[in-house]
Structure formats: C-alpha cells, structure tokens
UniProtKB/Swiss-Prot annotation:
The gene is frr. GO terms for molecular function: ribosomal large subunit binding. It comes from Yersinia pestis. This is Ribosome-recycling factor. One of its GO terms (cellular component) is cytosol. Responsible for the release of ribosomes from messenger RNA at the termination of protein biosynthesis. May increase the efficiency of translation by recycling ribosomes from one round of translation to another. It is found in: Cytoplasm. InterPro entries: Ribosome_recyc_fac, Ribosome_recyc_fac_dom, RRF_sf.
C-alpha cells in the first residue's frame, strides 16, 4: 500500500515537472524554435485548430522559422493567426512558404520573460509540494486506521520528502537552463 502511494506520488510529480518544462519551452528566447508557435490556433472549417496540425514548421536559421502550409488556401488564415497572437511576430508569405522572422529581444523584455519563467517555476514547485501533501495525508490515514506502524509512517514520509526534494531540484535545474538561455545574447 505504501509503495503504491509512493509510486503514485512519483508519477504525479513527474507530470508536474513535464507540465513546467512544457510551459517554459513555449517562452521565446532569442533563438528560433518551432515550439514558440505551439499555442497558436487557426480557424479551419469553423474550428480552432492547432497550427502544428495545419503546417510543417522548421527552423530556417537562428532567427527565422519557415512554415509550409498543407492547404494553400489556409496561408492567409495562418498568417493572420500568427500576427494576432501575442508573440509580436510579423510573418511574410513567399509563395508556398511563410517565413516568420523573430526580432531580437530587448534587455527589458528578457527580464520580463525571466520573471514569467520564475513564476512558472514557483507554480511547478507548489504543484510538487501539493502532491507531497496528498501522499502524506494518505499515509496518515493508513496510520489512523492502524494499517501501518508509526515507523512505517515516518519512513514513508521521509521517502516522499526525498522524492519531493529531487523533483524540486529538477525544476530548479530547468529554470537555471532557461534563464541562461534567455540572458544569452
């Protein structure tokens, strides 16, 4: 029973870490990355469809993304969706390819993005701590029902705390990498 609680906590902490990494991967750095356009939805036959499903996105050079739209009639809609997104990008169409140049980030914008990344990291840490609390509550319920001893309760809580510390270190490491990436000119 205790092993199941620990495994469940580990799986949930891993999901928290993945969610954090997914969030920060969408935050734009000075380099071109297809994940920058992940949040963009394009109106396609009356339905909001993710841009990734409608176009092939490749990195042309360090500051340019190239999109090849599968359905040529959607090119204008894709361009409009990119322009109206809050990313501050201005795509240009050249035949079948839409090029999206990424402007250089200003120092002020970099600092704002670092604040956003730090806030995301704190949210990730809070999520991991909530998983720890849930796991400890389950163990305490077992202790209350006399299904486990106090020694097992203590040992289990120590295991969950070690797991929590390990995942928080992973969040901090991902944060440090992203901050360095943002400040790298």
């Amino acid at each position: 029973m205790i092993n199941e609680i620990r495994k469940d906590a580990e799986v949930r902490m891993e999901k928290c870490l993945e969610a954090f990494q997914n969030h920060i991967s969408k935050i734009r750095t000075g380099r071109a990355s297809p994940s920058i356009l992940d949040g963009i939805q394009v109106e396609y036959y009356g339905t909001a469809t993710p841009l990734r499903q409608l176009a092939n996105i490749v990195v042309e050079d360090s500051r340019t993304l190239a999109l090849t739209v599968f359905d040529r009639s959607l090119s204008a809609a894709v361009e409009k969706a990119i322009m109206t997104s809050d990313l501050g990008l201005n795509p240009s169409s050249a035949g079948t390819v839409i090029r999206v140049p990424l402007p250089a980030l200003t120092e002020e914008r970099r600092k704002d993005l670092i604040k956003v990344v730090r806030a995301e990291a704190e949210q990730g840490r809070v999520s991991i701590r909530n998983v720890r609390r849930d796991a400890n509550d389950k163990v305490k319920a077992l202790l209350k029902d006399k299904e486990i001893s106090e020694d097992e309760d203590r040992r289990s809580q120590d295991d969950v705390q070690k797991l929590t510390d390990a995942y928080i270190k992973k969040v901090d490491a991902a944060l440090a990498v992203k901050e360095a990436e943002l400040m790298d000119f």
